[in-house]
UniProtKB/Swiss-Prot annotation:
Reactions the enzyme catalyzes: Zn(2+)(out) + ATP(in) + H2O(in) = Zn(2+)(in) + ADP(in) + phosphate(in) + H(+)(in)
Subunit composition and interactions: The complex is composed of two ATP-binding proteins (ZnuC), two transmembrane proteins (ZnuB) and a solute-binding protein (ZnuA).
The protein's name: Zinc import ATP-binding protein ZnuC
Record family assignment: Belongs to the ABC transporter superfamily. Zinc importer (TC 3.A.1.15.5) family.
Length: 242
């Protein structure tokens, strides 16, 4: 196992900013739940500025892979190399808000990180994520789409190198999904970001990804959206989506 905490001062440092021109390099990664192998010898890289989407069926290992990359799961087999001084922003698939604890959106964002960890002030990110109108509302009262924007703003306050999102649009309608992906594309250029995300939505994946990695415990195809849609393994796996 080869992993470091996501604290900037503790990330594995390399002489070059990027690892052989990649911001993340995953080599021969496997992971077991008890005796069941749920990730099987996965290798891939993420370049600076890419949107990479992890696509696959339920139970195929997408969320497990994400949790390994962000440091939640550590007892894996394989090697993960990050670029020097690497910072990750993480938007989980499920984020619960306790309705019994009064907390405004503004308080939640300002109290999410210590001053030493927070690289940008809330005011710095509000100009790019339009959530000013909900800052004084209770966290328990905002919609799922609004919550995703709040969590995205929270990620940006770290001034990350990459944002990793697990099923970020799963509960959004078509218009909200479209707006969210447009925002992600805008943020990439503003903040010099790379993005890894998981998704089930083929339409939005194909129109908003630079590269797609299809996994079902192991990688069965990988490439640009135009390459993936011609892949026989992909067509067989996702024929029910057509």
């Amino acid at each position: 196992m080869f992993h470091k905490l996501l604290n900037k001062s503790e990330i594995l440092a390399y002489d070059k900013k990027y690892v052989n021109n990649y911001i993340i390099n995953v080599e021969n990664l496997s992971f077991f739940y008890s005796k069941e192998k749920v990730i099987d010898d996965i290798s891939f890289q993420v370049k600076f500025g890419e949107i990479v989407t992890i696509l696959g069926p339920n139970g195929g290992g997408k969320t497990t892979l994400i949790r390994i990359l962000v440091g939640i799961y550590r007892n894996y087999i394989g090697v993960i190399k990050y670029a020097k001084n690497f910072i990750i922003g993480y938007l989980p698939q499920h984020f619960s808000v306790n309705s019994l604890i009064p907390m405004t959106v503004k308080y939640f964002l300002n109290s999410s990180y210590t001053k030493s960890k927070r690289k940008l002030k809330l005011s710095d990110v509000l100009k790019d994520i339009n959530i000013e109108k909900i800052l004084d509302r209770q966290m328990s009262e905002i919609s799922h789409g609004e919550l995703q924007l709040v969590l995205l703003a929270r990620c940006l306050m770290l001034n990350p190198d990459i944002i990793i999102l697990d099923e970020p649009v799963s509960c959004m309608d078509v218009n909200a999904k479209d707006s969210f992906y447009k925002l992600i594309n805008k943020l990439i250029s503003i903040y010099n970001l790379s993005v890894i995300m998981t998704s089930h939505d083929l339409h939005f994946v194909m129109s908003n990804s630079y590269r797609v990695i299809c996994i079902n415990r192991s990688i069965y195809c990988e490439g640009s959206p135009s390459e993936i849609v011609k892949n026989e393994k992909f067509l067989k796996m996702f024929s029910s989506y057509a």
